[in-house]
Amino acid sequence: MVSKRSRLDFEDKETLAEDASKIMKQPLSKLAKKSCGSHEVEENGSVFVRLLKASGLTLKTGDNQNQLGVDQIIFQRKLFQALRKHPSYPKVIEEFVNGLESYTEDIDSLRNCLLSCERLQDEEASMGTFYSKSLIKLLLGIDILQPAIIKMLFEKVPQFLFESESRDGISMPRLIISQLKWLDRIVDSKDLTTQMMQLISVAPVNLQHDFITSLPEILGDSQHANVGKELSELLVQNTSLTVPILDVFSSLRLDPNFLSEIRQLVMGKLSSVRLEDLPVIVKFILHSVTDSTSLEVIAELREKLNVQHFTLPSRIQASQSKLKSKGLASSSGNQENSDKDCIVLLFDVIKSAIRYEKTISEAWIKAIERIQSAAEHKALDVAMLLIIYGTSTQTKKGVERLLRNKIQSDCIQEQLLDSTFSTHCLVLKDICPSILLLAQTLFHSQDQRIILFGSLLCKYAFKFFDTYCQQEVVGALVTHVCSGNEAEVDAALDVLLELIVLNASAMRLNAAFIKGILDYLENMSPQQIRKIFCILSTLAFSQQPGTSNHIQDDMHLVIRKQLSSTVFKYKLIGIIGAVTMAGIMAEDRTMPSNSTQRSASVSSEQHTQVTSLLQLVHSCTEHSPWASSLYYDEFANLIQERKLAPKTLEWVAQTIFNDFQDAFVVDFCAVPEGDFPFPVKALYGLEECNTQDGIVINLLPLFFQEFAKDVSQVTSQESSQKSMSPLCLASHFRLLRLCVARQHNGNLDEIDALLDCPLFLPDLEPGEKLESMSAKDRSLMCSLTFLTFNWFREVVNAFCQQTSPEMKGKVLSRLKDLVELQEILEKYLAVIPDYVPPFTSVDLDTLDVIPRSNSAVAAKSRHKGKTGGKKQKADSSTASCTDTLLTEDTSECDVAPSGKSQVDKESTGKEGKTFVSLQNYRAFFRELDIEVFSILHSGLVTKFILDTEMHTEATEVVQLGPAELLFLLEDLSQKLENRLTPSFTKRVCFFKNKGSRNIGFSHLHQRSVQDIVHCVVQLLTPMCNHLENIHNFFQCLGAENLSVNDKARVTAQEHYTMSSCYQKLLQVFHALLAWKGFTHQSNHRLLRSALEVLASRLKQTEEGQPLEELLSQSFSYLQNLQHSIPSFQCGLYLLRLLMALLEKSAVPTQKKEKLASLAKQLLCRAWPHGDKEKNPTFNDHLHDLLCIYLEHTDNVLKAIEEITGVGVPELVNAPKDASSSTFPTLTRHTFVIFFRVMMAELEKTVKGLQAGTATDSQQVHEEKLLYWNMAVRDFSILINLMKVFDSYPVLHVCLKYGRRFVEAFLKQCMPLLDFSFRKHRDDVLSLLQTLQLNTRLLHHLCGHSKIHQDTRLTKHVPLLKKSLELLVCRVKAMLVLNNCREAFWLGTLKNRDLQGEEIISQHPSSPENTSEDSEDGMTSYVSRNRAIEDGEDEANDGQDRDSDESDDSSS
């Protein structure tokens, strides 16, 4: 064995440093001999030279490489043998090394020995490799020479530590240390380690880095621990070596505890390190993570990473642009690129760790998931989620789930996302496809907040990424637009609109993608079509003058083609596109003052284009009432949304005014000409009209002219006449009044005569003559009523915001007319079941609408058994006729405008009074604007009646009555339900018509949800006034001191109207306060405003009052309404309203008991109209109310026991049609609802119980056992009720929730019984005995289901029996665990029905299988219990057997 060489002979580090400095000061000439000739061979006769030559290596002088004549391994073997066989061995080794030292005193010779040898050509072919080692490397491979050679090398290194690199770029210290790398064997690794560490401690900084990073390649595994310890000390002393030391730690085999200590040390310095050091530091931290420490390390790393390191590139980018503008940018270019490279390298390290270590990605997700506050989230969190989503395929679902939760909890907001993209755009740009894929996934959500987040991902990707990524973003958005998902299409179009505003020039580069959407217009809603044409028109007309206008040409071509189409749907698309494009062209834009002449010429040119386009639309639609109506409505929407150039607006207003006046307005003195079936009168005038200057809407003559035409002629070809159809009356007037309002800042004095002018009509009130009318006359009168009704709706829309008392009074009068006409409509529709009203509001959503006749009436008729078959046949015929009528738009350009019945014959046979719901005809009514509800502010209004000389002749007080209030509240409630309540519509096939819930709300959907909420908040004060008035009304009505005569004066209709107003007000309040948008930070101000209004009704609120206090006061205010609830539905909506407030509270538990108390009061109250429990709607409401009660009560089991123990026995003992006296809502019809909810809540409650552990205190065990005893007792009571109420719904609930209860018992209760059996033996046995009786009933129910062969029940039997068998085995396992194996026995259980009678058909054929009743064996449980009480630890359980002789068990 080779003796251990002494280590480098330095007295201390200072001595080494001094020697090195002295050597550095000496010139190289003094250190070297004169070199020999460049081509000469070293002929020194020393042992060193002779042995090398004899072994096959020739030393060369000068710059020539040493020549190796034999294979490297052969050379080492020959030299080793020569040394070992030398006569003076081992002294020859010292002579050899001394010769080497002498030879290498010359720098050129030393360098030759350190560089690779030259191999002779004849030897090269035989070698397996072309790599040739240096002489020193070859000598280090010989064990007997290695220690001396290493010592010599370390003595040589100090001579060159402070020398600069030679002209050929070779660093002698690096070259010397490189000889020690990758040695096959290290003779004395400890000595080598010591010398390396001493060298590192005195070397210059630049060499220290290289020496440290070389350690893993030099040292053996056995020295890794020692090296790590010394490097850790060096790390503390010299922070500048942090990067190389940590880089080495990643390559050494070190103890995890040691690495943890180093990680903690480095983590403390993380916030102060340089940016260029971060990649290596983060790499070390991530590589040192273990499964157990991953979450802790990642959470700390997330906290310590300083965001300033990442904001540097964006700041440089901003400053760079400023410098470029001054011509000073070049000086900072290198620094910018360096910082960018550091950022990219850092995240490459993170992405690499995430890609290959699932633990790290999961830990990062968990670390972000644990953050609860929005303020604690950083841009790095969002960036990491996006990076993990794009890098790790295994955690995509986890990232999606976490993002959804964070968005819904409002933790990740738009500002944070903006900061993320602006800060990390360099890194996120590389994962742009993954970001778009994530956005696509979020687009499929049903939550609008999640869809909005997906939209923002696309928006910011377009804003911060390069041109290629922008193209990808636009392509992805176009794909979403063509997907067919309504919410997805809307979101994508909104993003495209925002991108045009953000960067129109970049969007124009992608116009070719967007134009492709035009091929999918047929399947889109009107609002979506408007957005598409708005996008394309903005791109087309926002270009600089002189640029290519190919987009404009394409737009004109598409619109002209669609306008000229004979397919009505395409014509409507053309109208929407033309009007939208005209609005973009004619939009009023502020021009620079220095280009007045040029802008004037451009404006004149655009005005000509706009007028010609509008004239084209008018000419293409004037023969079609439907198309004309849509044209006017579209133009009205345009006027309302955009500010047109004054010149264009003036031309439009004048044209519309003249057309309307010529078409619809006649003098009062004009006598209608024509052969009308009814007398014509000027009806519904609000003032006495003078025969000289009064005006009338000429409705009947115009409509009768069209009504008299043959339907086939109207639908087969367009009318050649240019007379305006009365179907366009309302839409034409809407356009007219918006033009006038836009011109005169909302003043409508020019057209105020239209508010109170009468209409030429017959007497619309049918009276007794309704039955004697022909079907044709009924259709005529019904259509006239529809047109009049819609005319007044538009009149109210127009003048609702006028401020003068006179105008307000007239608007209220028109509102009363609307209520009256609504009642008349119901009378006509009740006797014309197949009637199709005239369309007065036309868009693509209403093309396929079929007005549904009263299905409830049909069901009632079938229930009574009267004319059931005929009724069904008539309904089918009606649907067929309506389908035919409404699908003609695919082949013809117009349809029958009159809306008369397709069955032109008198109705034969009399039916009972039919109830008609006007909600089915919503598509045929003109939409009320949101501004109409400002009428709710109206109190008592004095209307002045003037004489012919404009003097006051009389005054009349007008106020908003209950009927008018109900009319407004119904419409407002529908609007809020449509816009504020999320719709969970499922994805539909793209090429199928989508049933839209938005029919009749087209104007509403052109306003933002925030705008609508703001409007409703402004209405809260008047609505509270109305709510309190109704509250007082019902309180007075219920007062005991109210006389019988006073109560009799309140008619049933008045009571119903006031009750309906009460319910609608509560619905409106609930829709507003339950709006999910209040969770968004930007909407908190709206929520506070709403709560301030409610809270101020109790006492004066203060500025800056805490939100929790406002919620509490609002809750108290609304809770006071409980004493005046007039109906069951009102009570339920009040509960839902209070729950909506409770959800926004930080401490909801304080109010939960009040909710439970109110719910119980509603359940224990006898409501009027007792037959309502047969109504499905009432049943749904009762189900919701009972759920609210049981969910909010503090003791669910006690509440269930009260209902089953008090209410149900009262019901059982009561007459058939009676109810429980304690719970009047509990009847035989509603028992199933009570039973289902109680079983579900019982199962939910026990499922949420924790099983507990053996280490819990005895008190905890006793409490849990007591709770389970109550649960099993409730379960027992409920299960036994199926003996009394054995209908299918009850049995189905027993099977379904009985199995779930048994499964919950197995999971939650049996572990508790395992470690409670010994201490609470009696309680456990009592619990099992009670449960055994219940499972026996479940077994009987399984047999009952089989014998009756009811597949609806039998499908639950296998799962239930499986659970019962598992229970038997689990009980046996518990007994074995407690050393009571002998207490368990199995027997057979006979199949019996619900009443306990044996099922003979399933009786086992073998008499041996029938013991003396397993029932008796099961009941012997009691005697065995007594034996156990006497000291025997026994328990028993039973097992059942069905007809197939398979063992079924119950316990």
UniProtKB/Swiss-Prot annotation:
GO terms for biological process: brain morphogenesis; cellular response to oxidative stress; DNA damage response; double-strand break repair involved in meiotic recombination; gamete generation; homologous chromosome pairing at meiosis; interstrand cross-link repair; mitotic intra-S DNA damage checkpoint signaling. GO terms for cellular component: condensed chromosome; DNA repair complex; nucleus. This is Fanconi anemia group D2 protein homolog. Residues 858-879, 1399-1451 are annotated as: Disordered. Required for maintenance of chromosomal stability. Promotes accurate and efficient pairing of homologs during meiosis. Involved in the repair of DNA double-strand breaks, both by homologous recombination and single-strand annealing. The FANCI-FANCD2 complex binds and scans double-stranded DNA (dsDNA) for DNA damage; this complex stalls at DNA junctions between double-stranded DNA and single-stranded DNA. May participate in S phase and G2 phase checkpoint activation upon DNA damage. Residues 1430-1451 have a biased composition (Acidic residues). Monoubiquitinated on Lys-561 during S phase and upon genotoxic stress by FANCL in complex with E2 ligases UBE2T or UBE2W. Deubiquitinated by USP1 as cells enter G2/M, or once DNA repair is completed. Monoubiquitination requires the joint intervention of the FANC core complex, including FANCA, FANCB, FANCC, FANCE, FANCF, FANCG, and FANCM, and proteins involved in cell cycle checkpoints and DNA repair, including RPA1, ATR, CHEK1 and BRCA1, and is mediated by FANCL/PHF9. Monoubiquitination prevents DNA release from the FANCI-FANCD2 complex. It comes from Rattus norvegicus. GO terms for molecular function: DNA polymerase binding. The keyword DNA repair applies. The modification Phosphoserine is found at S222, S716, S1257, S1406, S1414. InterPro entries: FANCD2. Homodimer; cannot be ubiquitinated and does not bind DNA. Part of a FANCI-FANCD2 heterodimeric complex that binds and scans dsDNA for DNA damage. Interacts directly with FANCE and FANCI. Interacts with USP1 and MEN1. The ubiquitinated form specifically interacts with BRCA1 and BLM. Both the nonubiquitinated and the monoubiquitinated forms interact with BRCA2; this interaction is mediated by phosphorylated FANCG and the complex also includes XCCR3. The ubiquitinated form specifically interacts with MTMR15/FAN1 (via UBZ-type zinc finger), leading to recruit MTMR15/FAN1 to sites of DNA damage. Residues 1-291 are annotated as: Interaction with FANCE. Its main location: nucleus. Residues 248-359 are annotated as: Interaction with BRCA2. It comes from the Eukaryota. Belongs to the Fanconi anemia protein FANCD2 family.
